[in-house]
């Protein structure tokens, strides 16, 4: 049985997640075991490329071999991730900001958060998009830190539904975040941007 959350504390391991193909492989292996051939077909990648990425993930301890099967006189291993969820430690934030690939990935993530606001009918004015991105990043990192602290303090997994457990965890995170002045300041400033009357946004 895989662990529910795997906290990555090694910056070199965290950098592996900056590659989209490796993220896609991990996502596949979180749900079920797959062979190299399975992954190559599913991701439309050549076999040697998948082998390369699998070896990196295997060496990093993010995946494991679950079984081996003999196919045409060859041994074909099957892989699965060691966890259903991966979390890059908040303590690595500063170190990883110096890595161009990881920084680009995180930049894209924040861009997507900004874009996701459109789904709620929220359009951030062009002149305030830079500010909104900075505030979103502060909120994201604050939530990331609170989540990490929360899961490290959990001493057992209660026998309740996953939805009840998740909502309880969210309440605890909100209580913790209320004590984070930087997070709360960013949240209030962000709310001022996204709650501006439409006529004000249009100038």
PLM features per residue range, with description:
Residues 31-35:
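Short capping segments at the starts of secondary-structure elements
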Residues 61:
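Glycine-centered, phosphate/nucleic-acid-interacting loop/turn motifs that mediate DNA/RNA or nucleotide
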Residues 65:
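Short beta-strand "wing" residues that participate in macromolecule-binding interfaces
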Residues 115-203:
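Charged, low-complexity intrinsically disordered regulatory/assembly segments
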Residues 38-44, 57:
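A short acidic, leucine-rich amphipathic alpha-helix
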Residues 15-22:
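Short helix-coil-helix linker/hinge
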Residues 9-13, 70-111:
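Conserved segment of winged-helix/HTH DNA-binding domains
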């Amino acid at each position: 049985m895989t662990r529910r959350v795997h906290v990555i504390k090694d910056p070199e391991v965290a950098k592996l997640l900056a590659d989209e193909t490796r993220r896609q492989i991990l996502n596949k292996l979180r749900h079920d075991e797959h062979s190299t051939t399975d992954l190559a077909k599913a991701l439309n990648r050549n076999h040697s490329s998948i082998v390369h990425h699998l070896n990196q993930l295997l060496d990093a301890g993010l995946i494991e071999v679950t079984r081996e099967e003999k196919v045409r006189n060859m041994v074909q291993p099957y892989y699965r991730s060691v966890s259903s969820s991966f979390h890059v430690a908040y303590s690595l934030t500063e170190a990883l900001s110096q890595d161009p690939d990881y920084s680009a990935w995180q930049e894209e993530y924040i861009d997507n958060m900004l874009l996701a606001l459109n789904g709620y009918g929220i359009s951030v004015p062009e002149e305030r998009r830079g500010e909104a991105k900075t505030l979103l990043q502060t909120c994201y990192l604050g939530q990331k830190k609170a989540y990490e602290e929360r899961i490290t303090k959990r001493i057992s997994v209660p026998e309740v539904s996953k939805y009840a457990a998740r909502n309880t965890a969210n309440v605890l995170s909100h209580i913790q975040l209320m004590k984070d002045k930087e997070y709360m300041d960013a949240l209030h400033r962000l709310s001022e941007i996204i709650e501006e009357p439409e006529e004000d946004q249009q100038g």
